[in-house]
From Swiss-Prot:
PROSITE patterns named among the record's database cross-references: CHH_MIH_GIH
More about this protein: Co-purifies with latroinsectotoxin.
Claim: Signal is one of the keywords in the record: yes
Annotated function: May increase the toxicity of alpha-latrotoxin and/or other venom components. Is non-toxic to mice and to the cockroach Periplaneta americana.
The protein's name in its UniProt record: Alpha-latrotoxin associated low molecular weight protein 2
Tissue specificity annotation: Expressed by the venom gland.
The keyword Transferase is annotated on this UniProt entry: no
Subcellular location: Secreted
SUPFAM superfamilies the record matches: Crustacean CHH/MIH/GIH neurohormone
Length: 88
């Protein structure tokens, strides 16, 4: 019985580790065949935008409808502008 529990635990851990670099497209309203690399990059834009604006709702709005809303576009622009600004 202990072996079975250990195997189940190991499988769970390996599944979590293997899935670290992948996201569920359905969570973002995207088609299942979306390129994972593109999904990760767009997700990162939304995370950076949320950090820039310091508001939790930004991430949710940014990723809506597979990153096709004006919120995502504005996040890209905001991040580009933030890069141009000299550090304080």
């Amino acid at each position: 019985m202990l072996k079975l529990i250990c195997i189940a635990f190991l499988v769970t851990v390996l599944t979590l580790v293997a899935g670290e670099d992948s996201l569920d497209p359905a969570e973002y309203g995207c088609a299942d065949d979306i390129n994972q690399e593109d999904l990760l990059k767009k997700n990162d834009v939304c995370l950076q935008c949320e950090d820039l604006h310091k508001e939790g709702v930004v991430f949710s709005l940014c990723k809506t409808n597979c990153f096709t809303t004006q919120y995502f576009t504005n996040c890209v622009k905001d991040l580009e502008e933030a890069e141009k600004e000299p550090p304080e």
